[in-house]
Regions:
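Extended hydrophobic
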Residues: 169-246
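A structural signal for short hydrophobic beta-strand segments in well-ordered beta-sheet cores
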Residues: 57-59, 106-107, 206
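Amphipathic alpha-helical regulatory segments at dimerization interfaces
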Residues: 36, 88-99, 105, 179-182, ...
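Amphipathic alpha-helical effector-binding/dimerization core
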Residues: 62-162
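N-terminal helix-turn-helix
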Residues: 1-86, 245-253
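Generic alpha-helical structural signal
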Residues: 12-15, 90, 94, 174-177, ...
Length: 259
């Protein structure tokens, strides 16, 4: 690695703390962080005070434990690429929610997880949705299955590495790869929710002409059968896939350009 021409030790310590909390995924005490980074508790404490004041880390129910807040996520969403995705997706999400009487969500990959970056509530009194910033393993969601299935081979290999580092079992990763072939053939994923009984998750890939690693996001519907539902579960996947294709077209993507 090329040595940086300038050093900013305080900034480096702050970034190390953020990366540590993101990598460990479970709340950590100041002593835990100091031990992980090989630094003294006092220097970590000073940095944590600043990060907590700025809203980048927060206390859990256990006041001794710290975790990342959604602040980094919120800052990241201000960047132009993500705003372009939002601008293209939100009108289609709103229209799809009204047509299907279902909640709609938009998810992207984050290491070995998916993160929900946008959502539209169901116009119906009954629906299912998760909060913005919600994270879940790639292997435990339709969004994750879609994003894995429609990634390039190189990017899929990277996702598998991240899953292995996160403790995923080889048999589970083999099952994920087998399911990916079926999803690629269908053009969408449709599976019972692994979070809530009675919900069927339907997801379809969104592509961006400026992104080369495959699907940039998953348009996902946690489908709930209600008396007011305007679309049957059998017809829903086609509508979700069509909406995802329109969003992709808005982002300048066409199937011809797919590598």
């Amino acid at each position: 690695m090329t040595e940086a021409p300038y050093k900013a030790p305080a900034l480096e310590k702050g970034l190390d703390i953020l990366e540590c909390l993101a990598g460990l995924r479970t709340p950590q005490s100041i002593s835990d962080i100091a031990r992980s980074l090989g630094r003294s508790r006092s220097e970590i404490y000073r940095m944590v005070v600043v990060l907590e004041t700025r809203g980048y880390v927060e206390r859990t129910d256990d006041p001794e434990k710290l975790q990342l807040s959604n602040r980094l996520f919120e800052v990241g969403m201000r960047s132009p690429p993500k705003m372009d995705l939002h601008e293209a997706a939100l009108p289609e999400m709103s229209a799809l929610a009204s047509r299907m009487m279902q909640s709609i969500q938009l998810a992207v990959v984050s290491s070995d997880q998916i993160v929900v970056i946008a959502r539209t509530e169901s116009p119906d009194d009954v629906g299912f949705s998760v909060r913005l910033g919600h994270r879940r393993s790639i292997m435990k969601s339709a969004s994750g299955l879609v994003l894995f299935s429609f990634a390039t081979p190189v990017y899929r290999a990277k996702m598998l590495e991240d899953l292995a580092e996160g403790g995923a079992q080889p048999s589970d990763m083999e099952s994920l790869q087998a399911s990916a072939h079926q999803v690629q053939e269908a053009g969408y994923a449709c599976m019972p929710s692994r979070m809530v009984d009675g919900v069927t998750d339907i997801g379809a890939p969104i592509f961006d002409s400026t992104i080369s690693h495959g699907a940039v996001a998953s348009l996902t519907v946690p489908f709930v059968v209600t008396r007011r539902a305007k679309v049957s579960l059998q017809d829903a996947p086609g509508l979700v896939a069509e909406a995802a294709q329109r969003i992709s077209a808005t982002l300048g993507y066409s199937p011809v350009s797919k590598s």
